[in-house]
A protein has these predicted regions:
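Conserved ABC ATPase signature
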Residues: 170-174, 178
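Short catalytic/signature loops enriched in Gly
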Residues: 3, 9-15, 29-37, 164-165, ...
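A short, proline-enriched helix->beta-strand linker immediately N-terminal to the Walker B motif
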Residues: 189-193
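P-loop NTP-binding/switch modules centered on Walker-like glycine-rich loops
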Residues: 200, 204, 208-286
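Helix-to-loop junction immediately C-terminal to a conserved catalytic motif
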Residues: 77
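Conserved ABC transporter NBD signature motif
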Residues: 85-96
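ABC ATPase NBD coupling module
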Residues: 36-39, 94-110, 128, 136, ...
Length: 353
């Protein structure tokens, strides 16, 4: 047994995992006032999110803290039940639940957590973590010799060599980057088709982030994995991802190829994200190309009507405050959920000037 995936006759653009109108609302604990008013409040963490993860490609889901992007990853990993919508694996709707059905699902879809310091049990060695994962997923082999070969193959795959130098180490004896590589190796032990990488480099030193992203890119190409890359860093999405989706307050507001989305953003929120990113070429006092908006994200217990970005948007129209914008197709396969791209809204925009 090796950690290589079996060859597949399907093309590299096949959809492996798909979310269709996925929604997740969390109930809020009722206070005395809620009981008296007979009301139930919910957090609208994710609303009507649709996305596709394709074999051999990286899809980035970008947004600021609290946008719901990590909740999307956990929904795709079947760690939370859906409020509405469906998840399809290989074209078939799935609802993993628990027990055997959940184990069968996670063999195909693995989640890499953000914190490499918390995702590994500090009292167990690297050997224990990887051996346990191989045995759970039936990939340990038929004997001790084959198990050792499989352990070595996993560590070599994540570029921790020589393997014997790492197998007997405890997590506290590893650097942050090495721990994250062990976490990736543990995910590969299942032989998955999909990796859900939830901010995999955000807690690592800047000097080693690029190495982990390059490792994930290598795995994508060698094993033809579909990868969802969750991040708040839109610059790294441009570097690492083939496709970028931008999420704000529980909804995806823009999508397209990463180069176009990051270099020519269509949605005002994407423009705000890019304008907020550090830019060494921006001279102090230099005027921005355009006003990009300011303020804080809205409460998801009582999200705004219409477009959820309208309280912060410098280009908001009256329609934005009352009607939720659909996706408008743009050139080159891109789209944006913004009334600015509805031709019927153009006259109204002129009137508000």
């Amino acid at each position: 047994m090796t950690t290589e995936q079996p060859k597949d006759v399907r093309t590299a653009t096949d959809v492996v995992l798909e979310a269709r109108s996925v929604t997740k609302h969390f109930p809020v604990r009722r206070t005395g006032k809620d009981l008296l008013a007979r009301r139930r409040r919910t957090v609208h963490a994710v609303d009507d999110v649709s996305l596709e993860l394709r074999r051999g490609t990286v899809t980035a889901l970008v947004g600021e803290s609290g946008s719901g992007k990590s909740t999307v990853a956990r929904l795709l990993a079947q760690l939370y039940p859906l409020t509405a919508g469906e998840i399809r694996l290989g074209g078939t709707a799935v609802k993993a639940g628990r027990g055997r059905s959940f184990r069968a699902y996670v063999r195909q879809v693995q989640l890499i957590f953000q914190d490499p310091f918390a995702s590994l049990n500090p009292v167990h060695t690297v050997r224990y973590h990887l051996t346990r994962a191989l045995r759970i997923h039936g990939r340990a082999g038929s004997g001790a010799t084959e198990l050792e070969a499989n352990l070595a193959a996993l560590l070599e795959r994540v570029q921790l060599t020589p393997p014997g130098q790492y197998l007997e180490k405890f997590p506290h004896e590893l650097s942050g980057g090495q721990r994250q590589r062990v976490a990736i190796a543990r995910a590969l032990a299942a032989g998955p088709q999909v990796l859900l990488a939830d901010e995999p480099v955000s807690m690592l030193d800047v000097s080693i982030r690029l190495g982990v992203l390059n490792l994930l890119r290598d795995l994508k190409e060698r094993l033809r994995l579909a990868i969802l890359y969750i991040t708040h860093d839109i610059a790294s999405a441009r570097y690492f991802a083939d496709t970028t989706l931008v999420m704000y307050a529980g909804r995806i507001v823009e999508g397209g190829d990463s180069e176009s989305v990051t270099q020519h953003p269509a949605h005002p929120y994407t423009q705000l994200l890019i304008a907020s990113a550090p830019d060494p070429g921006r001279i102090a006092g230099q005027e921005a190309r355009e006003e990009t908006g300011s303020g804080e994200p809205p409460s998801l217990i009582a999200p705004p009507r219409g477009c959820r970005f309208h309280p912060r948007c410098p280009q908001a129209m009256e329609r934005c405050r009352t009607e939720l914008p659909p996706r408008f197709d743009l050139a080159g396969g891109r789209w944006a959920a913004c009334w600015l791209y509805d031709t019927a809204a153009a006259p109204a925009k002129e009137e508000t000037k």
